Structures are given as C-alpha cells and as structure tokens.
Amino acid sequence: LEFVSLIPDSALDFLKRLVETPSPSGFEEANAAHFREYVAPFADRVTTDPMGNVIAAVNPEGSPRVMLAGHIDEIGFLIHYISDDGCCYFRGIGGHDNVVLVGQRVVIHTNQGPVPGVIGKKPIHLLTDEERGKKVDMADLWIDIGATGGREEVLAAGVRVGDPATYEYGYTPLLGDRAAARAFDNRIGAWVVAEALRRVKELNPKAAVFAVATVQEEVGLRGARTSAYGIDPHVGIAVDVTFATDYPSMDKRKVSELSLGKGPTILRGANANRKLADHMIRLAEEKSIPHQLEATPGGTGTDANAMQISRAGMITGLVGVPLRYMHTPGEIISLSDADNAAEWLAVTCASLGSGDDWTP
C-alpha cells in the first residue's frame, strides 16, 4: 500500500491494535490501555475518569480549552440467557442490522479468556413460507460455541450471563489506501484525536488541547457527557465516521455526496457552530487539506450532540471520516481521509487563541 508510508509505522501499528482489540460499549478497558500507551510519550498529562474515558492533554493550563473526542467503544453483543441445550442467547450492544448476523463468527469475552462461536439460526431449507417472509429477529438467533453437553459444558468453558461478544474480524488492507476492519466505527476517530494531539504538540499551541477516548458512545453518548462536563471546554470537536455514499444503493438525495479518499468531512447544521466550521474550512483551503461538506439539520448521533449541550453549552464541531458499510463486520475507510483529519484538527487547535469569539 503506497499510502501507508505517509503514516509513521508506530501510528499505523496503533491503529491496527485499536481495531483488533475488542472493546464493546461498557468493556473498553483494553483499548483504553492502548490509547494511554500511545499518547504517553507526547502528552503533558494523561488521566482516566470514573467512566473510563482516557483524557490526554497538551498544554493543559492554556486557553481556550479545546476537547477532541473520538469514541473507543464498538457495537457488540451481551449474553443474557444460556439455554439447557447450550445455546447462548444475546442482546445487541448498540444498533445492529440483523440481516448480516446469521452465520457470523464471533468471540465471547469471558473472565477465563476468549471463547469462539458462530451465530446460529434455523436453516432456510426448514423455514415455513411465513417464516421466510419475516424480518430476522435477534431473539431467534443464538451463539453456538460447539457445545454438545448443554448448559453445563458452556459454563465449564467460562461463559456467563453478562459476558460481551464481538465479531471475529481484524484489520485487512485493501486496494490503494483503503482498509477494512470490524470496528473502524469509531476506532478511527480515537486514532485521529490521538494523532492530532501528537502533531499539535509540535506546533506549540496557545490552547489547552484535550484528546479524549470516550466510552459508551454506542449506547447513548455517555462518555462524552461526563468527560465534557469534567473538562468544561470552550470548544469541542468530535471525530466520528460518517456515511460514504460512493457505492450502489446509496441515495445521495437522502444523505449527502461523500466519497472515500476525498478528505474528511465537516458538519454544517444545528449541531455545529457556524463560525468554527467556516474557520476550519478556511484553514483547510489555506493548507490544501482535502475536505468534504456534510449537512445535518438537527442533532447528530455522535459525541458532538452530547458535547454541545454540556453544562451551559460549548462551541461545537464535527469532523467525519467517510466509511462504507457502517455497523457491519466489514467497514471500509480510506487511510488518507484519517490522516488528513488528524492534520486538520492539529492546525485548527494551533490556530485558536484566548481572544477568539465564536459566539453565534
């Protein structure tokens, strides 16, 4: 991959560790450790709050206070019932498209270690006409770990009610600068804010810059709420994936026209401060950073939503990394979009000063 040479090996290795380490919402500790390890050499301060958010700061006493948020959790499954015949029934952690679940290889993460399994369902050959016409219901699916001795064999393997599970897919390079992985939503956002912090350190910002690996975004933007309250930033910019529309079935009239490889996106709409968005667009044009415009009329389903209304409110922005096939085991991104997002955030943070007025 020609593009990979533009990203330091250590940064690319960090990204691979992030996407290959399972961390569904509520179980983010392993990836929080990766984040802390990566930012430690250049951050002036690294802390972890009671929710599990990792907060890395450069120039923490500076002004204004700027929060960059990228969530490190992912969608997954939670075991809630083990049947007498040894089937592990589950609920979704975050939102799932049930159509893609059947037959997927998964891993249950137990206190005794990982237990592989497969999501099972009644074969199509045995479905009645009525059953074939129904939507796939998660309640009709189960995780099969190969047990033939019923519930006792499953328990002996270490599986318990309350254990999380995730898809068994890691990082896969594709053509050009593209890559596929299970959890680019939103490990790529966490990677971007960490990389932005590393780069802004070299620019000696006047602002206090806080890169936050937020938790539990997929179940209600919970980590962003608490970390934003604690940091009390003047400016908050979230980084998350957004819908690429450069493949079949995507109706640009209903979403936007966004493509892989054409740069990160900047939100325009109620969930973004207009002055900040315009400032970032001007910076991107001056620095020749590829970028795309995205529009949403109301709140978004991202950390930017929680950040904007934290305490008495803050100046908020949202940067997106275009992604194909969101919330599936095979999400695809362009590495150049992520690299450009990190650069964009770094120069943005370096441009901010205590006398700036972003009030609408």
What is each model feature region?
Residues 1-360:
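N-terminal hydrophobic/helix-forming segments and targeting peptides
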